[in-house]
């Protein structure tokens, strides 16, 4: 993953990776200097409270009617989400020594990526399909995900989980396999998502207990490994075809994605080539067809060097009418990180309302564990917003997130905005031990993403007093979304 490492100290901007256009202008130099001299004070919180628009009441009846119609549809999804989070975060129940999601009807059919480098799309969508089983059965389109126009890579060039997250969280998908069949080399325009993914958690590296609880809660965990095998090939010194068992002990970077769907603490060490030091393995669902392994499944030793380092789980999946509009400028998602060499920073994205709406929720990435956040919303933002961003008003949501990942946070009260009105979503982030706590998209020079800086207006600040435009200064967009309903 490409990373922007920006440190603003005194009057200069220092970067580990230099990006064009990152020179600070005279105003931002002065601001940075004042922050340094003035200490870490925060005068912005004394600003006026957000005002309620007169038109808010007029839209209440329509909103209540819509919410009533959605209530029954959402009821199952909300209960499922609450139960998942309870299992994942709160359960102290002892874990079984063995679990196989196949036996619970919680694994989607094994698919075949064939000769294309699309394992990342298959593993992502398999994990997503598993997350809704057995109550809902879906077959999502890997073709549509891997043909995302914001990514430059072809299907033969591979991908990674951040690309899957960007596709799903920007509401480009998922669409169904029927709408966009796999392997024809084309993807229809104008397809609408059949689900909205609102939360994706990234679990700690090699945390077996958390991974297992996530499998129990959500049906599967997307992860990565290194393999010398190609699609359908079983020739590898690290794979035992008789036992469908694999273990790679070296430090080579991962090149293949799978879905963890179970485990067996007593899976024998002797089943691996070469023999593992200890018993125990994860059960994984592959995308090489049913001829591979045990009907498309295989065991990977707990001692594998890579499996369990990167762990993605889809914890909140909602109906496509959960919100009317999504405001965003980060179609390529979390490409890098931005900050001031400290664990805290402020960020803001400014949007122009298309209709008379109410802002209901805000979405953002927590770049590491135990991220604390405070969310504000500023109305009637002027064309030059740097001074206005100091007057944030009241906190509309705050909390602490135990896992890294993407979160949609409902506001404690909906904020009305008028058609054509500029409004700012403002967030304060504090991520322990991080020095760049703000997730951004930018051109990392790796040929993966097609970045559009014209669709965003983002700002960052160290203390919330002096703000700089990230499109102008760092050539990036802030990953900070807003969800609205039409009044």
Residue positions per predicted region:
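Buried hydrophobic-core signal for structured, non-transmembrane domains
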Residues: 360-364, 409, 425
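Sec-dependent N-terminal signal peptides
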Residues: 1-4
């Amino acid at each position: 993953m490409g990373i922007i490492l920006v440190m603003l100290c005194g009057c200069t901007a220092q970067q580990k990776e230099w990006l064009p256009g990152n020179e600070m202008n005279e105003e931002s130099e002065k601001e940075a200097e004042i922050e340094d001299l003035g200490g870490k004070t925060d005068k912005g919180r004394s600003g006026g409270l957000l005002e309620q628009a007169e038109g808010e009441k007029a839209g209440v009846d329509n909103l209540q009617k819509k919410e009533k119609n959605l209530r029954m549809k959402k009821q199952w999804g909300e209960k499922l989400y609450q139960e998942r989070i309870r299992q994942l975060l709160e359960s102290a129940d002892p874990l079984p020594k063995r679990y196989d999601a196949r036996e619970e009807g919680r694994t989607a059919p094994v698919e075949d990526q064939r000769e294309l480098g699309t394992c990342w799309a298959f593993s992502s969508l398999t994990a997503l399909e598993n997350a809704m089983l057995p109550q809902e059965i879906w077959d999502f389109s890997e073709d549509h995900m891997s043909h995302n126009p914001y990514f430059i890579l072809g299907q033969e060039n591979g991908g990674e989980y951040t690309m899957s997250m960007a596709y799903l969280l920007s509401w480009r998908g998922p669409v169904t396999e029927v709408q966009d069949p796999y392997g024809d080399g084309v993807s229809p325009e104008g397809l609408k998502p059949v689900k909205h993914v609102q939360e994706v958690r990234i679990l700690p590296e090699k945390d077996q207990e958390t991974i297992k609880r996530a499998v129990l809660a959500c049906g599967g965990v997307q992860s990565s490994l290194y393999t010398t095998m190609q699609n359908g090939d079983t020739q590898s010194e690290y794979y035992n075809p008789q036992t469908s068992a694999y273990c790679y002990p070296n430090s080579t970077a991962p090149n293949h994605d799978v879905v963890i769907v179970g485990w067996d603490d007593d899976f024998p060490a002797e089943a691996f080539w070469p023999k593992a030091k200890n018993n125990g393995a994860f059960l994984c669902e592959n995308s090489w067809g049913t001829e591979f392994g045990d009907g498309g499944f295989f065991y990977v030793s707990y001692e594998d060097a890579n499996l369990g380092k990167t762990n993605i789980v889809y914890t909140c999946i909602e109906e496509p009418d959960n919100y009317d509009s999504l405001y965003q400028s980060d179609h390529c998602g979390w490409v890098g990180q931005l900050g001031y060499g400290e664990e805290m920073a402020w960020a803001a994205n400014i949007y122009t309302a298309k209709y008379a709406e109410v802002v209901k929720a805000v979405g953002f990435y927590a770049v590491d564990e135990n991220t604390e956040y405070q969310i504000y919303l500023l109305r009637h933002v002027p064309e030059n917003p740097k001074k206005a961003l100091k007057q944030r008003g009241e906190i509309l949501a705050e909390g602490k997130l135990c896992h890294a990942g993407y979160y949609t946070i409902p506001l404690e009260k909906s904020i009305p905005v008028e058609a054509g009105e500029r409004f700012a979503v403002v967030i304060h982030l504090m991520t322990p031990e991080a020095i760049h706590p703000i997730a951004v998209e930018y051109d990392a020079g790796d040929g993966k993403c097609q970045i559009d800086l014209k669709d965003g207006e983002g700002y960052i600040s160290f203390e919330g007093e002096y703000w700089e435009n990230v499109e102008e200064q760092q050539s990036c967009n802030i990953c900070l979304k807003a969800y609205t309903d039409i009044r």
